[in-house]
UniProtKB/Swiss-Prot annotation:
Known role: Required specifically for induction of eps and yqxM operons by antagonizing SinR. Regulates SlrR activity. Controls the initiation of biofilm formation.
Protein name: Transcriptional regulator SlrA
Family annotation (InterPro entries): SinR/SinI_dimer_dom, SinR/SinI_dimer_dom_sf
Record gene name: slrA
Pfam families found in the cross-reference section: SinI
Organism annotation: Bacillus subtilis (strain 168)
């Protein structure tokens, strides 16, 4: 099961990097964006209302 999840993550990461490169971004830009998204989610976690 773990290897299946890892393969999905690897595939998703690869697709994200390909998409970023197609619009002229590098891996550093993607990593910086992901870190800023994670930080903003942690700050706003209590304010977020789930909509299922």
């Amino acid at each position: 099961m773990k290897t299946h999840v890892k393969k999905d993550l690897d595939k998703g990461w690869h697709m994200l990097i390909q998409e970023a490169r197609s619009i002229g971004l590098g891996i550093h830009d993607v990593r910086q964006f992901l870190e800023s998204e994670t930080a903003s989610r942690k700050k706003n976690h209590k304010k977020t209302v789930r909509q299922d």
